[in-house]
Every structure is written in structure tokens, then in C-alpha cells.
């Protein structure tokens, strides 16, 4: 009987410690980029991306996006996802109609990162690229992100929603780093 109990405890310990240890061997930081082509001119794409308050109107992952009144001189937005998790975003750089950089400014999240949106004119349309410079602090979340979610998932969903907002079917292309 004691062997069974010890065996069961060992199994539970392995199930808890195994993912943690595996996650410790994965890098904390990652850099990923994805791009899409749109038939829209850069000014139109810029207007949509720069309107952080309008994201819930076209990206279903974002349920609300409001300016943070306590941002002081900095432009900070609080975006909430479908589960109600708040993500405070600082606008780091804004160069119309080509470059927007936002950074997660929360201290108690299991992740952090910077999104760089680049809009390039290509013919009469635009190439839109989102680069994520991310960091996942919790080793178990690192393992889950690597095995089940993928680091491109959120930027790909954003780009697909952007294309859909303009009535275009797009498939994000992963850009090698």
C-alpha cells in the first residue's frame, strides 16, 4: 500500500514539476512577425490601427478599449479581452501613416511585450507587418505558449481581423527573424 501511495505522489510531483522544468529550458523572450497585404492605402490602414479605442469594433478578441485617465502625459489605453483581463498599453511611438509602437505596461501579468505595427505602401495597397517582442515569465506559460498556442497566434488573429474589417480575406505570413 505504501508503494502505491509513494508511486502516486511521485506521479503527481512529476506532472507538476515536469512542465515547470521543461519551461525553464525554453527562452523567456521571443521575437515573431507576421504580414498581410491589403488593397487599402496606408492612410486608411493607419486610421484604423491608430484608433485604439475602435479596436472592439473590428477585432473580436478585444471587448473594450478606453484611455487610461491616470496615464499622465503618456498615452495609455486599457484593453480588455473576452475574459475581462485588462491589458494596459502605452503608445511608445506614432509616426503616421507608417509606424505605431505599443508596449504592455502592467507589472503583474505573466507576460510582457512590445508590438510594432509597420505599414508600407505597395502599389495602391499596403503591406502591414506586426512584430512582437515578447517575454513570458512563468515557465509553465512558456511551455503552453510554445506547444499549444504559438507565439504568432495573437498577431495573426489581429491581422486576420484587420483584413476582415476591410472586407478582404487574408492569410498572415510569418516573417523570418
Q: Where do the language-model regions lie?
A:
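N-terminal hydrophobic targeting signals that begin at the initiator methionine
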Residues: 1-3
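Hydrophobic/aromatic beta-strand elements that line small-molecule binding cavities or substrate pockets
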Residues: 34, 87-93, 113-121
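A short, structured loop/turn motif at beta-sheet edges
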Residues: 39-43, 92-98, 118-127, 164-167
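Hydrophobic pocket/interface hotspot
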Residues: 44-49, 55, 77, 91, ...
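Sec-exported extracytoplasmic/periplasmic mature domains
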Residues: 50, 54-57, 96, 160-167, ...
